[in-house]
C-alpha cells in the first residue's frame, strides 16, 4: 500500500490494479471512499481499462482477428509497478508480462 497526502486529503493506493483503497479527509478523519464491504462489493475504485462495460460475446475484432476481452478489461486484476512516489503524487505503470501478453492472444 502506498500513500500520498495534502493538507486536505490522504490517499492510499494498492499496487494490485493501482486501485485507490482509501481517501481520508485530513480535517476530520472521515473516509470518503466506499469501504469495500465484501457482502456487497469488495472493490473500491478499480481501474477499468481498456474498456468499461461488457463487449458483445466478450470479443472484439482488430485487423480481422477476433480477441477475447472480459467485462471491464484486464487492468484491475493485474499488478502495477510503483514508478514514482512523492508526498503529493504517485505514478504506477502496468508493464508487459506473460499475463498481459496472454490477454492479447487471438481468440481461436
Language-model features, listed with the residues they occupy:
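Surface-exposed acidic/polar loop and edge beta-strand patches at domain peripheries
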Residues: 1-105
Amino acid at each position: 500500500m502506498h500513500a500520498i497526502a495534502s493538507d486536505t486529503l490522504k490517499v492510499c493506493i494498492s499496487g494490485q490494479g493501482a486501485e485507490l483503497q482509501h481517501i481520508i479527509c485530513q480535517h476530520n478523519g472521515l473516509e470518503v471512499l466506499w469501504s469495500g464491504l465484501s457482502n456487497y462489493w469488495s472493490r473500491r475504485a478499480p481501474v477499468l481499462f481498456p474498456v468499461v462495460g461488457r463487449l458483445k460475446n466478450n470479443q472484439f475484432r482488430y485487423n480481422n482477428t477476433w480477441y477475447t476481452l472480459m467485462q471491464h478489461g484486464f487492468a484491475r486484476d493485474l499488478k502495477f509497478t510503483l514508478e514514482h512516489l512523492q508526498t503529493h503524487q504517485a505514478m504506477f505503470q502496468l508493464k508487459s508480462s506473460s499475463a498481459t501478453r496472454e490477454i492479447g492472444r487471438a481468440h481461436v
